Amino acid sequence: MYALEQKILNEGIVLSDQVLKVDAFLNHQIDPVLMQQIGKEFAARFKDTGITKIVTIEASGIAPAVMAGLELGVPVIFARKYQSLTLKDDLYRSKVFSFTKQVESTIAISNKHINAEDKVLVIDDFLANGQAALGLIDLIHQANADIVGVGIVIEKSFQPGRDLLLEKGYRVESLARVASLTNGQVTFVIE
């Protein structure tokens, strides 16, 4: 997605050959116009799959997921990373490891919001090692729902997440595929 790639080039900050900081428009400050374009792009790519729900993980996946949900006319469920006082019983739970934060978290969604009739699109802000996506997929499988695909805003293609998801048979649509962050430069996969 050209607009996203330009935003990454202009406002993204390469912190290392593994880490890209995009807090100017995605995961701290949010660019609503760009998020709307991202939502439209996900909707266009997955429009014929019969989606009934979108599942993401708090917090940075929420904005792109909500915009896609708005375009597709479906609800968005975000998995919580901590136990809340209002989220107690009847939960689907999974463990995920965050590459960026280097911590393992338990994520959960209420079983009241997803069931075996659902066709679910997973959306997340980044794809690195694929652990967040696999954790969300595990939650969806616990509900016996179908997964129509995984939508990623920024994929770090030099890490194994995409291949891991493809090997497991999931459709992966990434709006920006980063080939390298070497020498402080963002290079994209040419498709």
UniProtKB/Swiss-Prot annotation:
It catalyses: XMP + diphosphate = xanthine + 5-phospho-alpha-D-ribose 1-diphosphate. Xanthine binds at residues 20, 27, 156. SUPFAM superfamilies: PRTase-like (SSF53271). Pathway: Purine metabolism; XMP biosynthesis via salvage pathway; XMP from xanthine: step 1/1. Its EC number is 2.4.2.22. Converts the preformed base xanthine, a product of nucleic acid breakdown, to xanthosine 5'-monophosphate (XMP), so it can be reused for RNA or DNA synthesis. This is Xanthine phosphoribosyltransferase. GO terms for cellular component: cytoplasm. One of its GO terms (molecular function) is xanthine phosphoribosyltransferase activity. HAMAP family: XPRTase (MF_01184). GO terms for biological process: purine ribonucleoside salvage; xanthine metabolic process; XMP salvage. Homodimer.
